[in-house]
């Protein structure tokens, strides 16, 4: 039987509100009006920026160490 874990499932309770806030802040910075009437390019630019910022936050949290390496 297939494992029904969605890759979009949030693993931290309550994080959806923070992600939504980040999305709307970035959209405002980029001058993008989110919604069905926006182009996929405009909406995608917001999603791409969210990804960049989340990766940057994770890198800072790990102190720049590469994934899989033990901190010495």
Swiss-Prot record:
Annotated disulfide bonds: none
Keywords assigned by UniProt, alphabetized: DNA-binding, Sporulation
One of the GO BP terms on file: sporulation resulting in formation of a cellular spore
Parts of the chain that traverse the membrane: none
GO MF annotation list: double-stranded DNA binding
Site (Cleavage): 25-26
Keyword DNA-binding part of the UniProt annotation: yes
Pfam families in the cross-refs: SASP
Keyword Ubl conjugation attached: no
Comment field (misc): SASP are degraded in the first minutes of spore germination and provide amino acids for both new protein synthesis and metabolism.
Membership in a protein family: Belongs to the alpha/beta-type SASP family.
Known role: SASP are bound to spore DNA. They are double-stranded DNA-binding proteins that cause DNA to change to an a-like conformation. They protect the DNA backbone from chemical and enzymatic cleavage and are thus involved in dormant spore's high resistance to UV light.
Descriptive protein name: Small, acid-soluble spore protein 1
Organism of derivation: Halobacillus halophilus (strain ATCC 35676 / DSM 2266 / JCM 20832 / KCTC 3685 / LMG 17431 / NBRC 102448 / NCIMB 2269)
Gene name as annotated: Sh-1
């Amino acid at each position: 039987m297939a494992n029904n874990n969605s890759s979009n499932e949030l693993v931290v309770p309550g994080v959806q509100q923070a992600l939504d806030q980040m999305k709307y802040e970035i959209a405002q910075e980029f001058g993008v009006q989110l919604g069905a009437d926006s182009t996929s390019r405009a909406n995608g630019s917001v999603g791409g920026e969210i990804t960049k910022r989340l990766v940057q936050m994770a890198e800072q949290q790990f102190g720049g160490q590469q994934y899989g390496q033990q901190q010495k």
